[in-house]
From Swiss-Prot:
InterPro entries (alphabetical): ATP_synth_F1_dsu/esu, ATP_synth_F1_dsu/esu_N, ATP_synth_F1_esu_C, ATPsynth_dsu/esu_N
Function summary: Produces ATP from ADP in the presence of a proton gradient across the membrane.
Natural source organism: Guillardia theta
Protein name as it appears in the record: ATP synthase epsilon chain, chloroplastic
KW Oxidoreductase (keyword) present: no
C-alpha cells in the first residue's frame, strides 16, 4: 500500500518513487499523507519533508512550493529541494551561524526579508541532517 510521489524543482526531478507515508511542511503546519488521502492542494513552507519507504525515513529540504494529492498521486512543485544525503552537516552548521549573524545585522526591510528566508533555509538544512 503506497502512494506515488513526484517532487519537481525548476532544474530537476528530485524524487519520483513510491512511499508509504509523507510528512509535508505545509504553510499551516505539518501535514501527514497516507494512501487513500482525500484530494488536497496546499501551499508548502520552507522546511523538511519526510518520506517513509519501507521502514526508512528520508528527509528532504523543501524551499516552498505547492503539493497536490489526488488518487494516491502526490505531486510537489518546489522552488528548490535538497536531499539530506547531499548536505554536509558541518557546512550546514556554519551556514546557520553565518545566517544568524546576517539576520541580526539586517537593518533595512529588504535585508530583513532576505535574511529571514536564508535563516529558515539554513535551519531546515541542519534539521534534515540532524534527524
Amino acid at each position: 500500500m503506497s502512494i506515488h510521489i513526484s517532487i519537481i524543482a525548476p532544474d530537476r526531478t528530485v524524487w519520483d518513487a513510491n512511499a508509504e507515508e509523507v510528512i509535508l511542511p505545509s504553510s499551516t503546519g505539518q501535514l501527514g499523507i497516507l494512501k487513500g488521502h482525500a484530494p488536497l492542494l496546499t501551499a508548502l513552507d520552507i522546511g523538511v519533508m519526510r518520506v517513509r519507504v519501507d521502514r526508512d525515513w528520508t528527509p528532504i529540504v523543501l524551499l516552498g512550493g505547492f503539493a497536490e494529492i489526488e488518487n494516491d498521486e502526490l505531486t510537489i512543485l518546489v522552488n528548490g529541494a535538497e536531499e539530506a544525503s547531499q548536505i554536509d552537516r558541518d557546512q550546514a552548521q556554519r551556514d546557520l551561524e553565518e545566517m544568524t549573524v546576517k539576520f541580526n545585522e539586517a537593518t533595512t526591510n529588504k535585508e530583513r526579508i532576505e535574511a529571514t528566508q536564508n535563516l529558515r533555509k539554513a535551519r531546515a538544512r541542519l534539521q534534515a541532517v540532524s534527524a
